């Protein structure tokens, strides 16, 4: 008689399905890097707001900073998508993360050792917005390259959970650091988080691809 195939417990199947995209090594590196990076980013957002309000005592200034962060993303994300289609996505992400690291370090040094002015914070905010305009489309399309279409839905769900978790954890950590240390420490920690992500990208092993010019021909 034919032996009936063994059935896996429902709980085991559901857990495996929930974490399906993590079977891809590159996505695992990306996933844990995002946890670190997004937590640092939300820490910096809270610290930046605290700094701007202490410099100006103006709620309007806080709104202007949010505007400077978001307007480049609104205006230039399309160009970031075009760039992501034409060049290696990982290289774009390494470059954008390096720019973000430099800007966070600049914010740290100005806050810790200089007489920081609100206009300087504004320029850095705009620079980070420009960085995101090119980082976001490359990062989103890079997920498809890492997991393929089969596990894409699961990867999107995990990315969403990471984003929302970081949105809770990051501000909480920022509050502790602001009360125990300084606002500059938040900026420094965020810079370190970018460095961790850059190292993760550089350790990924990507499959060799045909030359883009060959593909067009």
Label each region the model flagged.
Residues 1-217:
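Alpha-helical transmembrane-bundle signature of multi-pass membrane transport and export proteins
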